[in-house]
Each structure stands twice: as structure tokens, then as C-alpha cells.
Amino acid sequence: MTNEVKENTPLLNAIGLKKYYPVKKGLFAKPQQVKALDGVSFQLERGKTLAVVGESGCGKSTLGRLLTMIEEPTKGELYYKGHNFLENDSETKALRRKKIQIVFQNPYASLNPRKKIGSILEEPLIINTKLSAKERREKVLSMMEKVGLRAEFYDRYPHMFSGGQRQRIAIARGLMLDPDVVVADEPVSALDVSVRAQVLNLMMDLQDELGLSYVFISHDLSVVEHIADEVMVMYLGRCIEKGTTEQIFSNPQHPYTKALLSATPRLSPNLRRERIKLTGELPSPINPPKGCAFNPRCWKATEKCRENQPHLEQHTDGKLIACFHID
């Protein structure tokens, strides 16, 4: 690995990431593949938030698992400050663990119920650093203060906390190694509405204080509008539209993006959109439709859409769109 980093090099650069899962239906059946992720590319700058949105099954959580190397991609490239993050040498593995962390969706399942909070937060330091016991405890207490947890919580168990407090613990654990990138996989969807805003505001404050970059995975577009700098809309394993938050919310172009936004409640009557009701379900990733994957549900679909797959193309405003019928 080289330490030379060009000034304009993005913090994280994903190129054509793919994840295919083999499926066997019988001894003599032809092998099939589930294309959970099929060629996703993006760049993430320091201190910015990229939101990844779409229906369940679109591949957004799979993307998060690939970025943190919980699973290895079938194909593609991933670079951190220009360094190949898919290499398996010990130096790259150690750097990966420190620089990219994840906060999972369910704070009730992501914390070990048999361990005290102090032990949960110390574990990354024990594995990845050479800090003394005193230094580890000091770092844990400092991080607990940052996320709004009192010092006396150090010796308590996860079941003693509310959902919002548990997610604060999960966020603290993700930040113990001072990462640059945090993958937040639906971090507030399992929480009560009353505490969602508190956790989101905490994440934004930590981003400002620590210079964090987020890959924010969500299906809640009202949350995305509040926190994201850029939005990537996914459908059946592919990116179909990507742009700044303002571009996506003020002028969506892909029919699927329009349908998603039409279902999002708006406070101002002037901002409300005509509701677009999609028919049918998300197609099977084992047997996706020919041409554009969205064509069976799209009111704009033509023969061209049913025969050809549109590629993601950049338009004059910088937005990326994969559709033959742009307004």
C-alpha cells in the first residue's frame, strides 16, 4: 500500500460492486443466481452523507455489508483514499476495520445481552489497539459522554436501557476506533417516533464534530431529506437515479423515484405531490424482467423499455439517471 493520496481523491470510491448468490433448486436443475447487487458505483466525500433508498429487496443493505466487508463482493472495486480496500493483506484488513464501521438497524439485537456496556465498547479497542486498561476505560467514558450516556451506565447491561439509549450505545461502539466512514443501516427505523429525531440530531452533531462521512441506508424519505447531502435510489440491485438531495426531492426524474416521493407525507399543501400508485410487486432477483427492471410496474414503459436496459447516464445538472423517458 502507498500513502500517497491525491488532493481530489474521494474518501470512498466504489466501482461496479456486484454481489451474486448462487441458488440451487434441484440436483439436475440449472444453477441460478440472485443478483442482490448488480454494478453499483458511487463516491463519498469527507464529512458528507450519501443516502441509499429503495424498497425492501433493492440491495441497499447488501451494499452496506459489502462496504464493511461483512461479505465480499462477487465483482467490483472499492477504494479508500485511493487504496484498494479489497486486498486481503493484514495491513489492509486492519485499516478496513478502523476506517469503516457499521451501525445496525435493531438496537435490541445488535448488543450482546450478557455483556456490560463498558465491555461492549471496550471490545474494539482490545482487538485493534494496544491501549492499556486505564486508557481504554477513559476512551470509552469519553465516547459515552459524546453520545449522551452518563458514566454510571458503564457497568449496566443492555436490557436496562430504552431503544434510543441502546442505539446511542451502538453508535458509540461504531465510533470507538475513530472511523472516517460509518454505514448506518436503517439506524432509526426500529425506534419510537419520539426518539428518532434525537438520534438523528446526535448523528449530525457527531458528523460535524468528528468529520464523519455516512452511508445512510433508509426507506424513510422524510428522514433522508433531513440528513443527506446526496441520494442514490436503488431498484432490484441497481442504481436508477442519483443526485443531490435538493435535485432528487425537488425534481425527481425516474418514474420509480417519483412514485417513492409521491408516497412521502409533506407538511405544506404547496409541496404535496399527486399520489402515484404502483401495481405489482418487486420482481424476483432470480428471474428479473427483460430490459428495464422497472418496466412491469412503470406507466411510461414502451417496447424499448421491455427490450433494452437503460444505462446510468449523467445529465446537464450532474444528476445520474437510468431511464429512456426523462422529462
From Swiss-Prot:
Alphabetical list of SUPFAM superfamilies matching this protein: P-loop containing nucleoside triphosphate hydrolases
Reactions mediated catalytically: a dipeptide(out) + ATP + H2O = a dipeptide(in) + ADP + phosphate + H(+)
Pfam families in alphabetical order: ABC_tran (PF00005), oligo_HPY (PF08352)
Chain positions recorded as ATP binding sites: 54-61
ABC transporter domain residues: 12-261
Gene3D superfamilies, sorted: P-loop containing nucleotide triphosphate hydrolases
Sample GO molecular function, one term: ATP binding
CDD domains: ABC_NikE_OppD_transporters
EC number: 7.4.2.9
Main localization, broad class: membrane
High-level lineage: Bacteria, Pseudomonadati, Pseudomonadota, Gammaproteobacteria, Pasteurellales
Function description: Part of the ABC transporter DppBCDF involved in dipeptide transport. Responsible for energy coupling to the transport system.
Cellular component terms per the entry's GO annotation: plasma membrane
Protein name (database record): Dipeptide transport ATP-binding protein DppF
This protein's UniProt keywords: ATP-binding, Cell inner membrane, Cell membrane, Membrane, Nucleotide-binding, Peptide transport, Protein transport, Translocase, Transport
Taxonomy, superkingdom: Bacteria
Subcellular location: Cell inner membrane
Similarity annotation: Belongs to the ABC transporter superfamily.
GO BP annotations, alphabetical order: peptide transport; protein transport; transmembrane transport
InterPro entries, per database record: AAA+_ATPase, ABC_transp_ATP-bind, ABC_transporter-like_ATP-bd, ABC_transporter-like_CS, Oligopep_ABC_C, P-loop_NTPase
Topology in the lipid bilayer: Peripheral membrane protein
